Amino acid sequence: MRKLNHALLAGALALACASCTAEKEANYQVIPLPQEVSLTQENPFKLNENVLIAYPENNALLQRNAEFLSEYIQQATNYAPKTKAIAAGEQVKNAIVLGLDPSIANKEGYVLTTTPEGININGQTENGVFYGIQ
């Protein structure tokens, strides 16, 4: 009986120590899983009824992505974000800005960044931006 108690105590101690050192694994509900997620201490971007979805002018595929995102947000929140074509380098606030970035390694890769003023979704291609939207 004493050996059984010692074995149970040793097992409980091992489990307690293991649970103290185990890292929590995030459960992101996106496919494919992001390769990297970085958190900052900045205030979050707050979606509101005046949010704008911007995309580069003369890019019909990103315009279609912007319209898709607008419809998605409207279904989820009842906000109806307007979409707007913007010139290269034009700055907008309270916006979700879609764009292309040829430095992204994967053709279907994307980088999503948030600030208190807005969200940027950049992809190497329009498909990458679409995956970032999802």
Question: Predicted segment positions?
Answer:
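Contiguous, structured surface segment used for ligand recognition
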Residues: 20-134
